[in-house]
A protein has these predicted regions:
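Conserved beta-strand-loop-beta-strand element in the redox core of flavoprotein oxidoreductases
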Residues: 1-13
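Non-catalytic, surface-exposed connector residues within folded enzymatic/regulatory domains
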Residues: 13-14, 73
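Internal hydrophobic alpha-helix adjacent to the cofactor/substrate pocket in enzyme cavities
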Residues: 73-93
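FAD-site-proximal beta/loop scaffold in flavoenzymes
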Residues: 15, 22-69, 78, 88
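Short, Lys/Arg-enriched charge-dense amphipathic segments
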Residues: 7-9, 36, 71
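Short glycine-/small-residue-rich Rossmann-like dinucleotide-binding loops
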Residues: 5-7, 20, 24-25
Length: 93
């Protein structure tokens, strides 16, 4: 990979075996925009450490709720939380 210093323009080679490319960090909340509460930063608001949104029976997880870490592993963990919250919600009905 060729790295370029954006200040000096200097280029240098870096030998690597793999590369992760970040393709964006804007949460995509359009699907639920007018149905659940959205923060000013455009993230879906959830109730504390749960995945419960402002609309009963709708749960959110991953990058659309996480303005801090934005990592695949934390998104996967919040997906598990959402699945468990949804299971609990459905079993109580």
């Amino acid at each position: 990979v060729v790295l370029e210093d954006t200040v000096t323009g200097e280029k240098r080679d870096l030998a690597i075996e793999g590369l992760f490319v970040a393709i964006g960090s804007d949460p995509r909340v359009g699907l639920v925009e007018n149905q659940v509460e959205i923060s000013d930063e455009r993230f879906i608001k959830v109730d504390g450490r749960t995945s419960k949104t402002s609309l009963p029976g709708v749960f959110a997880a991953g990058d659309v709720i996480d303005p801090t870490y934005r990592q695949a592993i934390t998104a996967a963990g919040s997906g598990c939380v959402a699945a468990l919250d949804a299971e609990h919600y459905l079993s109580s009905k």
